[in-house]
């Protein structure tokens, strides 16, 4: 009836406002939750090493480094695949002091899991489900949240999910992501593995869709080669994983 139609039309804006309020409240709740998990040990086992490596980069003025710290490998080429992270650490500490790295950690952690929450909320169509699943994810990750470059992999992985879950791939976003990621942390390798799964046309399998996905994947693979060691950076995680003398 006309009366029912008018009633439904009046209720629609109210429902929309309610959903928007719930969305923002869950983001706020998520921020507080993720901040609380950031109250862990600040100094990672190699935090000082990364700060010193950043200082070395600034002092030498080159990203192609030589190992002058160790005894057995002194003078050898140094594959510092996390050079950009080291520069960020050293720059941050030089500007604001080492104590403020805790704020850097909170910024990266909150951003990482808010992006994950947003990606999951959008994909599931349920804001509360996105909040709960992101909360479970950070609870699992909590023992590993300290000041080390691996936090950038958490951030970039969440960004990758946000860009690709339920969306068409955009090369102008994915290529810069992998160029930056490969120079921040070796976890880019897992990002490329996840990229293959996210790009594969599971529901619309055809030569054309597979070809399109492959072209995007190849472009991101080439982008990841834009680092000081080129393809050597791809071999480093494999060498580290299968070398029985690695810690």
Please report, for each region that a protein language model flagged, where it lies by residue.
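Start-transfer (signal-anchor) and selected internal transmembrane alpha helices
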Residues: 1-35
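Transmembrane-helix signature of polytopic, membrane-embedded enzymes
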Residues: 23, 28, 116-140
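Membrane-interface alpha helices of multi-pass inner-membrane proteins
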Residues: 34, 137-141, 162-163, 172-186, ...
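Transmembrane catalytic cores of multi-pass membrane glycosyltransferases
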Residues: 58, 189-247
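Short hydrophobic/aromatic helix or loop-helix immediately within or flanking a transmembrane segment
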Residues: 72-99, 103, 107
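Transmembrane-helix motifs of polytopic, lipid-linked glycan transferases
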Residues: 103-123
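Short acidic/glycine- and proline-prone juxtamembrane loop motifs at membrane-interface regions
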Residues: 144-151
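Membrane-interface transmembrane helices that cradle and orient dolichyl/undecaprenyl
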Residues: 157-172, 203
């Amino acid at each position: 009836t006309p009366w029912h139609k008018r009633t439904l039309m009046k209720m629609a804006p109210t429902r929309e406002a309610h959903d928007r309020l719930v969305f923002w409240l869950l983001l706020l709740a998520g921020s507080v939750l993720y901040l609380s998990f950031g109250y862990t040990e600040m100094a990672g086992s190699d935090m000082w090493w990364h700060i010193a490596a950043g200082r070395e980069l600034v002092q030498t003025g080159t990203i192609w480094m030589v190992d002058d710290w160790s005894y057995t490998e002194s003078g050898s080429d140094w594959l510092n695949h996390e050079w950009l992270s080291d520069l960020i650490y050293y720059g941050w500490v030089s500007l604001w002091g080492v104590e403020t790295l805790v704020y850097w950690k909170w910024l990266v952690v909150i951003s990482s899991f808010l992006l994950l929450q947003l990606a999951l909320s959008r994909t599931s169509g349920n804001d509360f489900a996105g909040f709960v699943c992101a909360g479970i994810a950070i609870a699992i990750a909590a023992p590993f949240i300290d000041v080390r470059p691996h936090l950038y992999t958490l951030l970039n992985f969440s960004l990758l999910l946000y860009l690709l879950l339920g969306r068409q791939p955009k090369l102008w976003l994915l290529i810069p992501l992998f160029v930056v990621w490969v120079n921040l942390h070796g976890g880019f390798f897992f990002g490329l593995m996840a990229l293959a799964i996210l790009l594969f046309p599971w529901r619309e399998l055809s030569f054309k869709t597979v070809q399109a996905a492959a072209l995007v994947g190849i472009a991101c693979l080439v982008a990841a080669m834009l680092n000081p060691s080129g393809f050597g950076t791809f071999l480093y995680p494999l060498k580290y994983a299968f070398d029985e003398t690695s810690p």
